[in-house]
Amino acid sequence: LGAFYNDLSAYHSRLTIVVLSEFGRRLGRNQSNGTDHGHGNVMMVLGGNVNGRRIYGTWPGLHPDQLDKRQDLQITTDYRQVLSEILVRRLGNPKLGVVFPGLAAYNPLGIVRGPDLPPDLSANTTTLADTGYQVFVPVIQQCR
């Protein structure tokens, strides 16, 4: 990731990289000494317009009483909160209701710099393409 970021150094002011997983891991081992999918996770954001060198969110703790159902890390920040801020401030796309149906509010954390457009939380548009805004979601296919 560092090499990729360095290779694109000429574009840092236009570059925002988000690294996340679609699932976390449970803290305890299962019957086969592995770990099952959990829901607490981490997300990293890199780029020239990122207010970096900080941790956003709160640490819930690892004591069994602090875990969700005594086995999962608590979720303290909704991933949509982070990604909606990037959509608005970095991609200039305020159509949050189309990208994230059911999102109740736009509450930026201050992770990235950029203009704050008034968010549109309605999902009135048939498809994202109908909005006239862009969302870049890379898809990497598995090579066989």
Model-derived segments and spans:
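Feature marks hydrolase-like catalytic cores characterized by long aromatic- and Gly/Pro-rich stretches
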Residues: 2-121
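Long, low-complexity repeat tracts used as extracellular stalks/passenger repeats
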Residues: 119-133
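Conserved functional hotspot residues at active sites or interaction interfaces
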Residues: 138
